[in-house]
């Protein structure tokens, strides 16, 4: 096994494989051919290179290149930096980060005062890397943003990270999206959120959580710090949304709730419409890719017209809503002065729908940047076309050119700007 010096692991960490023999240097664009060491220009890059040599760990030149970029920023006197080692870059060769790579990385970041964000999305750190991510959360008191989405982390890794957050008081934004932590991991996150008092933004989307939704609902009754919660693809049905709604009666902090890509129907909208009559904190609600249909849209419309004056953005994209329900939503916007963003693409438009939303835009009640449709006329008939606006168009990817952070494409983060700069 490797010599881990003073960082002795407690009993029970995920086992590391035997140390590989030092690998030949790859001839990447930032690594000189022939295996010679690259020019060292800063402390992070130098520390990483030296530690890899000391521990006989293969050097990941993608990490080395990214550390070089951060070193340059530090030399300019900048602080509060995010180290971005995303494994889905299209602009350069990528050697994805493994759990063993993350071990070395965590050791050099543990006392760094300049970096407060770490983005390692779309890599392969697995439960081994999750163990070291948990250690980092325990020791690094500057980190406010950690993105671990799609990293093959399982229930054991989810448990380690959740337990590390029991005592962490600095992390504000955590993305666990796409890691299959399952119900076991979800239970530990639910328990953590009853204790943690600093986390403001959490994404547990596509983590294969089902029963845990009930426990997360109970957690919202106790937690008064969380501002944004993403629960996409949880297989939430009407009983699950009822549990969440019961918690929202008592929660006074949540401003952004994302329950897209679930199995919520019109019956679930009865509970949600009721809680929106009294809830005054929720500002963004994402119901995309459910099946609320006309009845569900009408329940929401009645509440928005008569009671709620706090919701600013609503997405009902692809919900099998027909003209009757869509027109009801448009009518509620004429009465409700607060609701500014509505997203409806993927439903069943008739001519009455097209005319209703065209009128909203013509009168200035619905701004072109605040919806995902635009009107056009052919032979005297009004139609709606899709435009690339939404609550989180660039949540899972960013364009490699052009404006990466258009407000109209990511309106949810503009309206509720928790960690929006990260």
Model-derived segments and their meaning:
Residues 1-422:
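Leucine-rich tandem repeat or coiled-coil scaffolds
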């Amino acid at each position: 096994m490797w010599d881990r010096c003073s960082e002795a692991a407690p009993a029970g960490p995920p086992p590391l494989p035997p140390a590989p023999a030092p690998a030949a240097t790859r001839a990447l664009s930032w690594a000189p051919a022939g295996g010679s060491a690259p020019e060292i220009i800063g402390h992070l890059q130098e520390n990483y290179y030296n530690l890899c040599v000391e521990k006989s760990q293969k050097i990941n030149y993608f990490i080395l290149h990214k550390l070089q970029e951060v070193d340059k920023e530090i030399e300019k006197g900048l602080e509060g930096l995010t180290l971005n080692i995303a494994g889905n870059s299209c602009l350069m060769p990528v050697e994805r980060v493994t759990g063993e790579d993350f071990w070395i990385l965590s050791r050099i970041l543990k006392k760094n005062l300049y970096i407060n964000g770490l983005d390692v999305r779309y890599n392969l750190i697995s439960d081994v890397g999750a163990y070291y991510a948990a250690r980092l959360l325990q020791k690094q008191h500057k980190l406010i943003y950690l993105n671990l989405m799609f990293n093959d982390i399982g229930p054991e890794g989810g448990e380690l990270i959740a337990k590390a957050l029991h005592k962490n008081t600095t992390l504000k934004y955590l993305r666990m999206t796409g890691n299959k932590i399952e119900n076991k991991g979800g239970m530990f996150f639910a328990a953590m959120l009853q204790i943690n008092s600093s986390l403001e933004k959490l994404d547990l989307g596509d983590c294969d959580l089902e029963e845990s939704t009930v426990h997360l609902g109970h957690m919202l009754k106790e937690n008064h710090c969380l501002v944004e919660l993403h629960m996409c693809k949880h297989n939430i049905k009407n009983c699950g949304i009822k549990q969440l709604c019961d918690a929202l009666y008592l929660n006074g902090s949540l401003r952004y709730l994302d329950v897209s890509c679930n199995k919520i129907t019109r019956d679930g909208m009865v509970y949600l419409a009721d809680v929106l009559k009294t809830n005054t904190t929720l500002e963004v609600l994402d119901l995309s890719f459910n099946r609320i249909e006309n009845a569900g849209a009408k329940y929401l419309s009645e509440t928005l017209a008569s009671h709620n004056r706090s919701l600013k953005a609503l997405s009902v994209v692809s919900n099998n809503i027909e003209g009757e329900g869509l027109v009801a939503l448009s009518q509620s916007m004429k009465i409700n002065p607060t609701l500014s963003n509505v997203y409806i693409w993927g439903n069943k438009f008739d001519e009455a729908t097209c005319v209703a939303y065209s009128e909203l835009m013509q009168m200035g009640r619905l701004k072109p940047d605040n919806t995902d449709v635009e009107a056009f006329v052919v032979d005297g008939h009004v139609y709606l076309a899709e435009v690339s606006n939404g609550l989180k168009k660039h949540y899972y990817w960013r364009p490699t050119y052009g404006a990466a952070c258009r407000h109209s494409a990511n309106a949810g983060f503009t309206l509720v700007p928790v960690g929006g700069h990260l």
